[in-house]
């Protein structure tokens, strides 16, 4: 898995189930995407649901102008 600064920043529409993601804002939270809701319209938003390495459930919502860090791509 990549370090925080090495992970590429990509558009939310490029995230797939199985990817390990985190926000571009300062955080060390990473989680594996289990389900994606979206895009919702006006404004376009994607909500990602998943679990972190400790098994805790996580979710984040990203907008059209946001970027997401992808630490590992789904195989």
Predicted feature locations:
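Basic/aromatic-rich interaction segments and small domains that mediate binding to polyanionic partners
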Residues: 26-62
């Amino acid at each position: 898995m990549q370090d925080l600064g090495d992970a590429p920043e990509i558009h939310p529409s490029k995230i797939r189930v199985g990817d390990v993601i985190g926000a571009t804002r300062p955080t060390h939270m990473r989680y594996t995407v289990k389900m994606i809701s979206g895009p919702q319209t006006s404004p376009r938003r994607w909500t990602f649901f998943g679990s972190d390495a400790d098994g805790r459930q996580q979710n984040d919502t990203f907008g059209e102008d946001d970027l997401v860090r992808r630490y590992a791509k789904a195989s």
